[in-house]
């Protein structure tokens, strides 16, 4: 059993060992990081005592597992994509098509080019754009509608003419 421990790399992920069957059918601890135990045992060095094995185990628990790093990176990437799915940044022609479909071409005397120009210079065609004013109100969305009068933004006692939330 001691010789099997010398030859097999003893590695733990977090603090629980993961076992896999070896060639002889017994189970041995395995992980994604290898220790130097096989190199030490071949050169005659290394400790086979329980204290030596425990010291090596503690040292290995402090290291990051590459699989763990990959999982962390994947979770981070996915969490970055979630909020982005709620907002949209339009292209110039795409926004012009949408505004035309909603009948804004010629609305109140303003051409489609005027609406597209307004959207570009106020929000950069970004539907999630929010600008905070000095008085505590916010300008929201692609046309930067102000929360002081037109929509409700968690501030009590505002007119809320459109009867809707700014978000």
UniProtKB/Swiss-Prot annotation:
GO cellular component: acrosomal membrane; sperm flagellum
Entry annotated with the keyword tRNA processing: no
Alphabetized UniProt keyword annotations: Cytoplasmic vesicle, Disulfide bond, Membrane, Signal-anchor, Transmembrane, Transmembrane helix
Post-translational modification note: The processed form derives from the membrane form by proteolytic processing.
Keyword Transmembrane: yes
Domain spans labelled C-type lysozyme: 88-167
Membrane topology note: Single-pass type II membrane protein
Domain of life: Eukaryota
Cytoplasmic topological segments: 1-63
Topological domain spans for side Extracellular: 85-167
Marked site positions, Cleavage: 87-88
Transmembrane segment boundaries: 64-84
GO MF term list: lysozyme activity
Compartment annotation: Cytoplasmic vesicle, Secretory vesicle, Acrosome membrane
Disulphide-bonded residues: 151-166
Broad class of where this protein is predominantly found: membrane
Quaternary structure, from the entry: Interacts with ASTL.
Annotated function: Sperm surface membrane protein that may be involved in sperm-egg plasma membrane adhesion and fusion during fertilization. It could be a potential receptor for the egg oligosaccharide residue N-acetylglucosamine, which is present in the extracellular matrix over the egg plasma membrane. The processed form has no detectable bacteriolytic activity in vitro.
Protein family: Belongs to the glycosyl hydrolase 22 family.
Name listed for the protein in its UniProt record: Sperm acrosome membrane-associated protein 3
Annotated source species: Pongo pygmaeus
Gene name of the encoded protein: SPACA3
